[in-house]
């Protein structure tokens, strides 16, 4: 990445890339997988069979995702440290910080978290598209005497993925911790009487394409409501997991979601980078951002009456480089005319 660009803008570029890649898998990759699922052999405009397309996508995406995390870890995070912006790992928490985090866990996390033990009476839960989850290895018996062995912890979507530590607990700068670190640290408190042998984050991307025939739809609103709900639980198209996840757990998740190695991405960092966009609101460092851009207004549209400007000829606005305000003024004046 170009180092002359502001640091936080480079971070945002990486995060926007993640968001775009999510949508690519939800729609484009899902479309190719659907064609394979139903045995459609038709090739696309590029004369490539869906299986060939998917193989090529996997090859390229694995390379660029690896590069993305390498840039994040070896460049962006290191430069943020130099700028006194810290993502504090669990093993670096002080006693005071640990006490504060534990209180946050008890007051904010515990009331809204719902771990699910995996046993014959608790099958694998339905996990929402792109949600952060943890697969946990357990040893021992739960409060009901059951040997669970494994559990799933869905991270509460109502909680922020980044939490800022109080300034009085730190030695200056901006100090942030991941919600995933909090859940990792205190996961054992969610399973009384059992020992947590391992806790690993993962995320499933699902088919979010909406497919229906407009000519056959009688109630468009109800159809859209149904399609929007089903987007959360469509067929899995990608598995992302912490690279430290044991192979046995990876294979368990692959089997559960009917995915193979080509659809699995082992990452060295947070599995949902888009949630790091909260950094914009948590870190007030304008020196690490682009200067705010103020869109201009063409000279003829600066007057009080937009209709006078239009009578003199057509006016072209180039959004976002020029302000949208004249359009709003036009509607407001037309409503009063």
What function would you assign to each model-found segment?
Residues 1-337:
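N-terminal localization/anchoring segments of enzymes in phospholipid and broader phosphate metabolism
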């Amino acid at each position: 990445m170009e180092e002359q660009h502001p640091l936080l803008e480079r971070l945002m570029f990486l995060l926007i890339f993640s968001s775009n890649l999510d949508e690519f898998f939800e729609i484009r990759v899902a479309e190719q997988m659907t064609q394979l699922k139903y045995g459609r052999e038709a090739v696309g405009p590029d004369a490539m069979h869906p299986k060939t397309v998917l193989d090529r996508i996997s090859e390229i995406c694995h390379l660029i995702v690896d590069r993305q995390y390498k840039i994040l870890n070896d460049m962006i995070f290191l430069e943020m440290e130099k700028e006194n912006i810290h993502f504090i790992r669990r093993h670096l928490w002080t006693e005071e910080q640990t006490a504060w985090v534990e209180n946050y866990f008890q007051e904010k996390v515990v009331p809204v978290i719902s771990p699910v033990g995996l046993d014959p009476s608790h099958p694998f839960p339905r996990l929402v598209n792109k949600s952060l989850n943890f697969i946990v290895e357990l040893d021992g018996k739960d409060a009901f005497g059951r040997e669970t062995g494994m559990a799933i912890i869905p991270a509460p979507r109502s909680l922020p993925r980044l939490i800022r530590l109080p300034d009085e607990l730190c030695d200056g700068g901006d100090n942030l911790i991941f919600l995933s670190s909090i859940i990792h640290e205190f996961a054992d408190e969610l399973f009384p009487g059992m020992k947590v042998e391992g806790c690993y984050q993962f995320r499933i991307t699902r088919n979010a394409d909406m497919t229906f025939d407009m000519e056959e739809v009688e109630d468009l609103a109800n159809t859209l409501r149904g399609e929007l709900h089903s987007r959360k639980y469509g067929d899995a198209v990608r598995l992302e997991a912490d690279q430290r996840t044991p192979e046995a757990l990876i294979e368990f998740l692959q089997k559960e979601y009917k995915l193979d190695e080509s659809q699995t991405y082992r990452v060295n960092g947070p599995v949902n980078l888009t949630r790091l966009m909260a950094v914009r609101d948590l870190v007030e460092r304008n020196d690490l951002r682009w200067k705010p851009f103020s869109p201009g207004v063409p000279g003829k549209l600066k007057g009080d009456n937009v209709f006078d400007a239009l009578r003199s000829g057509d006016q072209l606005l180039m959004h976002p480089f020029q302000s949208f305000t004249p359009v709003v003024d036009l509607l407001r004046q037309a409503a009063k005319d």
